[in-house]
Amino acid sequence: AIKLFTAAADGARKDNRPDLMWPAQRGMARSRWGQAAQEKDQKKAAQGRETAIAAYRDALKTIEAIRSGSLGADESRSTFLATTKDVYDEAASALAERALVTAAGASGPLTGAALTDAAEAFQIVEQSRARSLLDMLGESGANITEGVPAELLKRKQDNLDRQQEIAEILTGASLNPDADKKSNSDLEAELNQLSTDYDSIENQIRAASPRYASLTLPQPLSLAEVQQQVLDDKTALLEYSLGNQSSYLWAVTQGGVSLFKLPGRSAVDQQAIDLRNQLVPTRLRTRIAGIDVAASQTRGLGVAAAAPDNSAAAAFATASNALYKTVVEPAASLLGDKRLLVVADGALNYVPFESLVTASGGADYSAMPYLVTTNEIVYAPSASVVSVIRKQTVKPTGKNILLVADPVFNSNDPRAKGAAAAPAADADTRGLGLASALTDVAGTPANQTPASGLLLARLTGTRTEAEEIAKLTRASGGQADIWLDLQASEANVQTKDLKNYRVVHVATHGLLNAERPQFTGLVLSLVGNKTGDGFLRTDEIFNLKLGAPLVMLSACETGLGREKRGEGVIGLTRAFMYAGAPTVGVTMWSVADRSTAELMTDLYKRMLTGQGMSAVAAKRAAQQGMIAGKKYSAPFYWAPFVLVGEWR
């Protein structure tokens, strides 16, 4: 087999066919690694592992060359990386295994050859992670369309306009049980083709752009660079790579690196799913694309009836501690009370580490030893992304905060006619699924908006939340702009100047579409719109120009999305990062309206008053307050809120 792969690689090189060369190089690496595993002579086995790793390096070098400059016009970088992700995983696994063998029996951080292998494996993992986001962040500061033929730019705009038109139709149709399924299927097919065409046009623009030719895109960081550029003496990185046979955890501080072997992907994913199913009541669970965690997709339920109580606490504690023991406990002695920067993988992307219980037992939510009680926790798509957004962040002056809340969802809401009276039905959770309509607490459908077919109830808690935060802002000497009712509109968000706000806070219903992440978004006023349909979708957020160091999305499931191999979770977080927000606050599931208002008010009080906490520290303190307060001590209420990106 090795001779065949060698001949195939030589032939591909001679014919200048890198697309055929990397599979041959990978085949050579796999064959040599398999041979080494069967070799009884330790010296020959070590030589076999080295030749296998060298072949993996060759394969990755070929893949990176294809990705950086010679992709076909009909192939997007993210799609290409997804198809080659296994090569990165196998190469990283080989190096990690060799590092662990070399370090066997040693205590403390890795040194010597073991550290060298672990560092190379880490960089390969970073190479395979969130690369499209890194590229987009690199391109965002450069006008790569300058000098590009006008016809090409027009094709791009026409394509985007049609995608937007179809998105508006499908968003409304997916919420309407009477929609024409055949018509929707045709539109879905057209949208798929438009998306493929758009990737082709983007690649043609890059090829035709003089600016792009001279643009140096951000490169994934080495382990030493992460220690120097990303971490501080109070922060530890936990980076996970889940593999078919084994998974790996890099625990990194400024002073050292440790590597741990974990169970394979399926085992870790199952533990994460088990915990998530304990965290989220059955009727509020969502099926996340690619990860089967759900039974149903009901929204707007009465939280008093659906939320967990202490009768479920023991089962939660068991599931939570089991996952903690698998993915955090191996590194616990290195962490102390450091801030944790978590770069997750697989189903770990859908579990808040704050909710992990560090010791088994217990049947009282308010008395459990949660990880959040000892550590601040922040998340990132990759360690390299943190470095890039940190370099690009421009801090606005002043203390301005923008608050967007309590939109008008229904045409017969009195506010739509200028009245101030509240509608009859309020929702208790902030979010909606694409498969079902919202009902009020009593189970009676809320008023319907004919244009969209959407049944959606008002969230009065978001108004209270925004007004309280505005008071806190003004009391601390800052300025708060607050958009309520019809002012909480898509047009205002898209057309007003948002660059001078230090915080942008949006409290409304979230719209999750895990199958098509570009349709995931925020629901703003659905009536009185002269432009737009009231849904601020992911693809529209990419076009915003933000200067706010913090964007807080106080809505349902804003941290969810589709996990694409090599990219992580694709959804609202990366859209807001691209738009200029280095830190994004999102939620992991459908959040309760009243408890969310309380948590957010407490969070801002700690940020804006004399305590002057960072957003990460304030969130942790607010969560601890909820745990101690007993009324909302179940993690269902406080754990879904996470911060992604910069923590400083």
Q: Which ranges hold each PLM region?
A:
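Short coil/turn linkers that connect adjacent helices within long alpha-helical scaffolds
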Residues: G11-D19, A65-I66, S78
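Catalytic cores of nucleophile-dependent amide-cleaving enzymes
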Residues: R502-D602, R606
